[in-house]
Every structure is written in C-alpha cells, then in structure tokens.
A protein has these predicted regions:
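Structural signature of tandem-repeat unit edges
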Residues: 1-29, 39-52, 62-75, 85-98, ...
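Consensus positions within tandem repeat domains that build extended binding/scaffold surfaces
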Residues: 32-34, 54-57, 77-82, 100-103, ...
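Ankyrin-repeat interhelical turn/loop motif and analogous interhelical turns
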Residues: 378, 408-412
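Long, compositionally biased eukaryotic scaffolding/regulatory segments
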Residues: 416, 420, 427-448, 452-458
C-alpha cells in the first residue's frame, strides 16, 4: 500500500496517511511512533493477526476518531494513543492484560471505553485528561491502578472499584471534579492519601466492611479508626466531630472542605499531616495538647482555618494561630502574629483567650506606637487600645473622623467616652466656610507581618 513501510510483518511507518485507512492482512505489529506524522488520519481498521501496538504508535493523530482493534491484540505500548484528542470510543479486546503508562493520555473526546476482563494493571497517566469520560466499568481482574491513571477525567461522576483491586496510587483520580461518590472494595489494601485529591464534588466515601478502610457519615478512616484519611469536600455535613480514638489526621484530609463550619479534634490526636486543613471552611481548629507532630503547611493559605494552640513550639510551626497562653511566653518574632490571633479570637468570640487579656493589654501598651498607626482600620484593635488606655489625645481626631466616615456610631461613642474620661471635653468639629468638615484621617502604616491582616472577614 502506498506510503506504508512494512517489513517482517511490522508496519514501521505510515508516512502521512490521511482519511480512513485499513491496514493490510499480514501485519502483526505496529512499530513505535509509526503513525506519529498522520495528523489527518480519521479512521483506522487493524487486521486480525495483529498482536502488538508499539510505544507512541498513534501519537498525535489529532483527527483520529475511530479505531477498530482486532481480537488478537495482546499488547498496547506506552503512549500508544497519546494526544489522539478526537478519539470518541474504543473497545479493547479481551486478550490484553494491562493498559500501559500514558496509553490514552490526552484523549479528551473519549466518552465510551470498555475495559475487558483480564486487565490486571492500569498504568500511570493512562487516561490522563480524558475529560469527556462519564462512566467507567472496571473488571474484577484489576489489581492495581497506578499514579495519576485517571487524573483530570473531569466528567466522571461515579466510581465503584472492583473486588480484587489491591492498590490505588498517588493522585490516581486527581481533578475528577464531577465525581460524587466512591466505593472501596474489601480487597483494597493500599490507597494513597491523595488518590482523590481535587475531587471537589465528592460527597461521600463508602467502604466494604472487613477491609482496610471504614467510613462514618461518608468520611474515610482506617479500619481501626485511628487515622482520619479523607473528608469528602462536597459533604453535606457542616460539623465534623472526629471520633474518640483517632490519633492521626492524614495529609490533605480536610483539603477543600469549604462548606464545613466546625471541626472538633479529640485529645488523643498526635499527628497532623501536610495540608490537612488547607481550604477547609471552619473558622478555627483547636489543637489537642497530646499533639506530637504537626506538618509545617497543615494550615497553609489565607483561606484555611485558624489553629488554636497552647504550646509555643506548635505555634512556631504555624502561619496564623490563636495562642492560649501569655504573649510573653512566646519569642519576640512570634508576638505580632500572636497579637493578631488574639484580636481575631476576641472578634470571633473564642472564650478561652479572655484568661490572657492582661498579658495582651500589657503588650499593646508596650508597643503602643506600632499598633496606633493602623488602629483606624481595625475596630477590634482600636477597642483593645482604648481598654489598654494608650490612645493619646492627638490621635483622637483622626480616629473619630475614621469612625464617622465608616458610619460607625458605636465606635464614635466609644472614642468620645474615652476622651471625656481621660482628657475632659470632646474636641470641637472642624468648620470651614460655615460647613463642618471631618478631620483628616492619618494614613495607616503597614500592618505587622501577620497573615491575619488584609484577609478580610472569613
């Protein structure tokens, strides 16, 4: 056939074949990258007797829509259909035993896929970016799903992993953003903690009894209930009281649980993994005193909860925190963040911080100039400075003007009351041309180096 280079039963190059093509009888293998230049190929029929597709055999056949595979096929090489972005449906023959790494990488139009019995392994990145794939039936012969195998399959809605499956790799279903439920079989022994990372629509996990995993209210735990593995990001739960007996919060366990409003940890929790609470919607999480290991980025990011802790060493590992202790217990470098945490706790009604009020008021007195410079923009801080009795008379006009501009009569009343108690009569308003004019607001200095400032209300 013109343009096809065939020797010893191997089709080594298809040249620039275009349109529909039937590979002739007698070809037993397709060589590595044999069709990689065929960007105008649209349909392909492979003959009976063919047993092997080489690595990257149809790489970048961007217009290839349909492929008929023979029953005799035994091996599909790595990346065989990589970037075949127009491929819509494919029936794999029963003689295959594995789907190699990157086999269907980037097949964005693939909506139907039949994976036959006999397949025992699905390789890394095998179906990455198959964003149109809605349903997936996996055979009972399957034993392993490797790293990122179904990553980015954004239309996949439900997933039942078959009995017999033993291992699911890292980020195997990462970014499957339509996936709503996952059922885990009793046979599953290895599940990477971030296997379902980024599955933002996931509402529940289900696990067969007697296996390595268990579920309570759709939340995934180890079978012995000592490790909380994953809270589904789209769970209907608004409060999660982690059961007594849990000792570890796995990496990314509450990642992206933006609708969750309250998380309660038992006192026995000893370890909290990386990114455990990143993006969780709870305002705060109280850390237990038994805590032995806290990953540096467990609460990373401005949209994560505030950690409440009573241990200076734990506080030193946090980006933002409420410290249940005297601020003088902390090293100097942590005190700006601790003061910010105290103000946040006062604003949000965290009751335990009231025990340390005297310590923080003394800190505000000692650092008066530092905090006065931005009190006009932070009402909680302003009220604390008034309570600490450190606002000088020359600052009152600007603070009163700021309160008026923000239409906060409560702050205005507090400032006037403070002025009367400490300095006598209230200052007269400024008058220009017969009209009353507010005093200018002093430009606030940069806030302390703390992630609490500039984040807005949660």
């Amino acid at each position: 056939m013109t343009g096809l280079q065939i020797s010893d039963g191997v089709l080594r190059s298809a040249g620039d074949a275009a349109g529909a093509l039937c590979v002739p009888e007698g070809v037993t293998a397709i060589g590595d990258r044999a069709f990689s230049a065929c960007t105008d190929l649209t349909e392909l029929t492979l003959p009976e007797g063919l047993t092997e597709l080489g690595e990257g055999a149809f790489f970048n056949c961007i217009r290839l829509r349909r492929v008929t595979l023979p029953a005799t096929l035994r091996r599909i090489g790595a990346g065989a259909f990589r970037w075949c972005g127009a491929l819509e449906a494919l029936r794999l023959p029963a003689g295959l035993t594995e789907i190699a790494d990157e086999s269907f990488f980037g097949c964005a139009a693939l909506t139907e896929l039949s994976i036959p019995a006999g397949i025992s392994r699905i390789g890394s990145w095998a179906f990455y970016g198959c964003s149109a794939l809605r349903t997936l039936a996996l055979p009972a012969t399957l034993r392993r799903i490797e790293d990122s195998a179904f990553r980015g399959c954004a239309s996949l809605e439900e997933l039942t992993l078959p009995e017999g499956l033993e291992a699911v790799g890292s980020r195997a279903f990462f970014g499957c953003e339509s996936l709503k439920s996952v059922s885990l079989p009793r046979s599953l022994r290895e599940l990477d903690p971030d296997a379902f990372f980024g599955c933002t629509a996931l509402k529940e996990y289900r696990a067969e009894a007697g296996g390595a995993f268990s579920t309570v209210d759709g939340v995934l735990y180890s079978a012995d209930m000592r490790t909380l593995l994953a809270f589904p990001p789209a769970s209907m739960l608004r409060r999660c009281a982690v059961p007594e007996g849990v000792e570890e919060i796995a990496p990314a366990a509450f990642f992206g649980a933006g609708e969750l409003r309250e998380i309660t940890l038992p006192e026995r929790v000893k370890r909290i993994g990386a990114a455990a609470f990143v993006g969780a919607g709870a305002a705060s999480v109280r850390l237990p005193r038994a805590l032995e290991m806290l990953a540096d980025d467990a609460f990373a990011g401005r949209q994560s909860p505030v950690a409440i802790c009573a241990d200076p060493e734990t506080a030193a590992r946090l980006e933002k925190f409420v410290y249940l202790g005297a601020i003088d217990d902390l090293p100097e470098r942590l005190r700006p963040a601790a003061a910010a945490g105290y103000l946040w706790a006062v604003e949000h009604g965290i009751p335990d911080v009231s025990r340390f009020r005297a310590s923080y008021l003394a800190h505000f007195r000692a650092e008066r100039e530092r905090y006065l410079s931005f009190a006009a923009e932070d009402e909680t801080l302003l009220l604390q400075l008034l309570e600490a009795e450190v606002v000088p008379t020359e600052a009152l006009e600007g603070l009163l003007a700021a309160a008026a501009r923000r239409e906060r009569p409560d702050l205005t009343a507090a400032l006037l009351d403070y002025q009367r108690r400490h300095f006598g009569a209230a200052p007269a308003p400024l008058e220009l041309g017969g009209e009353t004019e507010e005093a200018p607001i002093p430009a606030p200095a940069p806030p302390p180096d703390s992630p609490f400032y500039g984040t807005g209300d949660r």
